UniProtKB/Swiss-Prot annotation:
Record organism: Aspergillus niger (strain ATCC MYA-4892 / CBS 513.88 / FGSC A1513)
Cell compartment(s), UniProt: Secreted
Keyword Secreted on entry: yes
Disulfide bridge positions per record: 37-115, 63-76, 177-184
Family listed: Belongs to the cutinase family.
Domain of life: Eukaryota
GO biological process, one term: carbohydrate catabolic process
Chain intervals for the UniProt region annotation (Disordered): 216-245
Protein name: Probable cutinase 2
UniProt GO molecular function: cutinase activity
Active-site residues from the entry: 126, 181, 194
EC class of the enzyme, as a word: hydrolase
Lineage: Eukaryota, Fungi, Dikarya, Ascomycota, Pezizomycotina
Keyword Magnesium attached: no
Amino acid sequence: MKLPYFLLGLAGLAAASPMGLAERQLSDGNELRDGSCKPIIFIFARASTEPGLLGISTGPAVCNDLKMAKAGQVLCQGVGPAYTADLMSNALPDNTSPAAISESESLFKLAASKCPNSQILAGGYSQGTAVMDDSIKQLPDDVKDKIKGVVLFGYTRNAQEGGQIGNFPKDKVKIYCAMGDLVCDGTLIVTAAHFTYVMNTGEASQWLESKLSDTTTSSLTGSSSSDTSSSTSTGDSSSESSSAAGLGGLSGLTGLGSSTSGGFPSLASLF
């Protein structure tokens, strides 16, 4: 039965931002490849089934926030097209495909080589968090040093990596794991909580801005002075709790088992 994978796909389709689709798509998400350098480069990996390179929820929201705060200084790049954001890749050992990991690595290296004076910010949602984790931890140190901050929404490798990105400074990572989002516990069980992260994008954008050096000057209104709000955190890499209010009708979405051997279940166990 393939219904559980359909439910996992809802994570990408149901996490709609309150703002309109057209308003959220101010960037085509291919600005690093197609454009000239700017002081800040934001690289993002979308959730499973989300269209485009940035997706239609958390990615465009953070991109737009950063562009509003740092007018004319930000370019946004989504991971794709090699990263297809397909459902089946969630069950692979790295919780995403080798092609996606390789493409993400290449984008970070491109940012560092094409724009050596730029600061890099990054993020991911759902399967996109695995893309970020698996690619960033493999980067050479000189490229890692250029990455100032990473935000992860619904971190699918949160349990496997101990609430951080492997081989990367914890104080450069902000993890949002909503209360009741079981993918953060190392499962493929999708609940309503996994759809709530658009509520965290404003704070996430402010946190990313706070990690930048003083080479850029404008500031997001109401920037947070702390890495956490109403959440429990471990060090600087924190797990945020967010409410599933308004999504109670989806709260019964379950159906996938717990992970084994550090990854998600084998494909055979999902049908």
